[in-house]
Amino acid sequence: MTAIWIAIAALSALALAFGLVLGYASRRFEVENDPIVEEVEAMLPQSQCGQCGYPGCRPYAEAVSLNGESINKCGPGGEAMMLKLAEKLNVDPQPLEGDADIQAPARHVAWIDESNCIGCTKCIQACPVDAIIGSTKAVHTVVSDLCTGCDLCISPCPTDCIELRPIAPTPANWKWDLDTIPVRVIQVERHA
């Protein structure tokens, strides 16, 4: 019985020693990050879709903040994201990458033909935002509110049962152009 207590005490002392060494090492060798990179990364949609040409939002935030990369490459963020980045980084807004005439392309979401889905889960593994639900050997479904339309789930599908479909505009997702709506300003008298 005493051998068990000796083993427990020895392992506890060893764990404490390793904890102290790791704690010291984390403070001693800490790498300081640029706060602007953290702020830009927090502004990005975190879809990790790769449409910007970078493997995720963090590398794109580093490229925009430190290397002067174009701020118009975030597809899921769209024009609103580009304007926020321009304001944050004190640069001029740029037209969205792609066709200059198309300012806001129609939003697309993935759609699964459930009659052909075999439940292989390859699309679930490829989806960077977990917008596809389902389990092995069961039919999968896309949660359209979470889908960013990045099309990363289409190529791994062995039965080609996934396609991107445009979302019809509704009052909830319509891009309101508030600058073209006439506004009448009424002067109000103030009484003391």
Curated annotation (Swiss-Prot):
Biological processes, Gene Ontology terms: electron transport chain
Subcellular location: Cell inner membrane
Entries under InterPro entries matching the protein: 4Fe-4S_dom (IPR007202), 4Fe4S_Fe-S-bd (IPR017896), 4Fe4S_Fe_S_CS (IPR017900), Elect_transpt_cplx_RnfB/RsxB (IPR010207), RnfB/RsxB_Proteobac (IPR016463), RnfB_subfamily (IPR050294)
Main localization, broad class: membrane
Class in the EC hierarchy, top level: translocase
Domain 4Fe-4S ferredoxin-type: 108-137, 138-167
Free-text remark on how the cofactor is bound: Binds 3 [4Fe-4S] clusters.
Listed cofactors: [4Fe-4S] cluster
Residues the record lists as binding [4Fe-4S] cluster 2: C117, C120, C123, C157
UniProt entry keywords in alphabetical sequence: 4Fe-4S, Cell inner membrane, Cell membrane, Electron transport, Iron, Iron-sulfur, Membrane, Metal-binding, Repeat, Translocase, Transport
GO MF term set: 4 iron, 4 sulfur cluster binding; electron transfer activity; metal ion binding
Binding site for [4Fe-4S] cluster 1: C49, C52, C57, C74
Enzyme nomenclature, EC number: 7.-.-.-
Occurrences of domain 4Fe-4S (ranges): 32-91
Keyword 4Fe-4S attributed: yes
Residues covered by region (Hydrophobic): 1-26
GO CC annotation terms, alphabetical: plasma membrane
Family recorded in the similarity comment: Belongs to the 4Fe4S bacterial-type ferredoxin family. RnfB subfamily.
Subunit note: The complex is composed of six subunits: RnfA, RnfB, RnfC, RnfD, RnfE and RnfG.
Known function: Part of a membrane-bound complex that couples electron transfer with translocation of ions across the membrane.
PANTHER family named in the record: ION-TRANSLOCATING OXIDOREDUCTASE COMPLEX SUBUNIT B, OXIDOREDUCTASE
Protein name as catalogued: Ion-translocating oxidoreductase complex subunit B
Highest classification ranks of the organism: Bacteria, Pseudomonadati, Pseudomonadota, Gammaproteobacteria, Enterobacterales
Gene: rnfB
